[in-house]
């Protein structure tokens, strides 16, 4: 009997260690991500300020470096006001459903060779499935607010996200054909051999479609009709305040970094060095992801907001046909002597 008790205690201790280690790894991923989100807002204000010949944040800390911390403290101190006609439970559930997929998707993102929380073979499929759930948070937030502005913004956002997910999915089919794997680490390893081996070159139209569709997916300018200030105040989160509003903000920027990271992994060689004489590593992943994020901010500073009908037309009549044509072209070329150019 004593032996059985000791064995059970040993199993419990092993289970506890496994759970504790998993929680440590999750925190090691989430904490830097939240810091990255905070300082992406700072970078956005600084970079767009520089493009518009302004200074940007410069009051809190050296060169305004503590501005994100000040913003977080301000939002934490504000009251979360629930409108009188709102559905209380769904109103609170909306931000949770928005942030959860944005964080959960990071479980399968590899930062370097072997540096990944969960290296699963269906990583690409997992990311596509989990990120598509973010739209439920948007719809619930808009509907539960009991506001016409919020509901209109939610409907716009939901239609836009669903429309551009199709183009993004087709773009990923091209990557899947080239790498012949759904494992994100294997997709990166398939681009080994320098910058000339990146999938950016044979799949360039799919790269452009994926990048622009990613901007639309995250409701960023110039595709931010869901929160068009001049038309419907602030979109689906118009009734939110305090930390509930901040959670939507975090979800948007976490999704931005996620799209940039996926673009890096699938088209720009991930953590692989572009030249043979420099070693691979997480530094390359950070530099490439930072470059894609810079493009996101550059788009915002450059382009005016599109009309809703223009956004829908671009998604359905331009991007989806381009991706289908290029997938057929790549599939056909793979059956010819030039097929090695697409692997």
UniProtKB/Swiss-Prot annotation:
Single Gene Ontology MF annotation: oxidoreductase activity, acting on NAD(P)H, quinone or similar compound as acceptor
Subcellular location(s) of the protein: Cell inner membrane
InterPro entries: NADH_UbQ_OxRdtase_su1/FPO (IPR001694), NADH_UbQ_OxRdtase_su1_CS (IPR018086)
Recorded GO CC terms: plasma membrane
GO term, biological process aspect, one: aerobic respiration
Main location: membrane
Listed transmembrane segments: 19-39, 89-109, 124-144, 158-178, 198-218, 257-277, 279-299, 314-334
Protein name, per record: NADH-quinone oxidoreductase subunit H
Keyword terms, alphabetized: Cell inner membrane, Cell membrane, Membrane, NAD, Quinone, Translocase, Transmembrane, Transmembrane helix, Ubiquinone
């Amino acid at each position: 009997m004593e032996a059985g008790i000791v064995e059970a205690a040993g199993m419990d201790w092993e289970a506890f260690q496994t759970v504790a280690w998993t929680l440590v790894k999750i925190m090691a991923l989430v904490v830097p991500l939240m810091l990255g989100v905070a300082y992406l807002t700072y970078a956005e204000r600084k970079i767009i300020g520089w493009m518009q010949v302004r200074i940007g944040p410069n009051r809190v800390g050296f060169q305004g470096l503590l501005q994100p911390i000040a913003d977080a403290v301000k939002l934490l101190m504000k009251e979360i006001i629930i409108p009188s006609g709102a559905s209380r439970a769904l109103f609170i559930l909306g931000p949770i459903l928005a942030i959860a997929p944005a964080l959960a998707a990071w479980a399968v993102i590899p930062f370097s060779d072997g540096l990944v929380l969960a290296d699963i073979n269906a990583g690409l499929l997992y990311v596509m499935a989990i990120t598509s759930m973010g739209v439920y948070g948007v719809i619930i937030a808009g509907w539960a607010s009991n506001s016409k502005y919020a509901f209109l913004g939610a409907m716009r956002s939901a239609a836009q996200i669903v429309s551009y997910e199709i183009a993004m999915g087709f773009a990923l089919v091209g990557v899947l054909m080239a790498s012949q794997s759904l494992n994100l680490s294997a997709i990166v390893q398939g681009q080994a051999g320098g910058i000339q081996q990146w999938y950016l070159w044979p799949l360039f139209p799919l790269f452009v479609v994926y990048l622009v569709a990613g901007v639309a997916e995250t409701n960023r300018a110039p595709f931010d009709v869901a929160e068009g200030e001049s038309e419907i105040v602030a979109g689906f989160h118009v009734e939110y305040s305090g930390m509930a509003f901040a959670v939507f903000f975090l979800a948007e920027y976490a999704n931005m970094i996620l799209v940039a990271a996926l673009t890096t992994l699938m088209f720009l060689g991930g953590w692989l060095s572009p030249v043979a004489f420099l070693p691979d590593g997480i530094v390359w992943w950070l530099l490439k992801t930072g470059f894609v994020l810079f493009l996101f901010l550059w788009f915002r500073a450059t382009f005016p907001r599109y009309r809703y009908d223009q956004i829908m037309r671009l998604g359905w009549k331009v991007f989806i046909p381009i991706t289908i044509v290029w997938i057929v072209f790549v599939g056909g070329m793979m059956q010819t002597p030039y097929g090695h150019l697409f692997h």
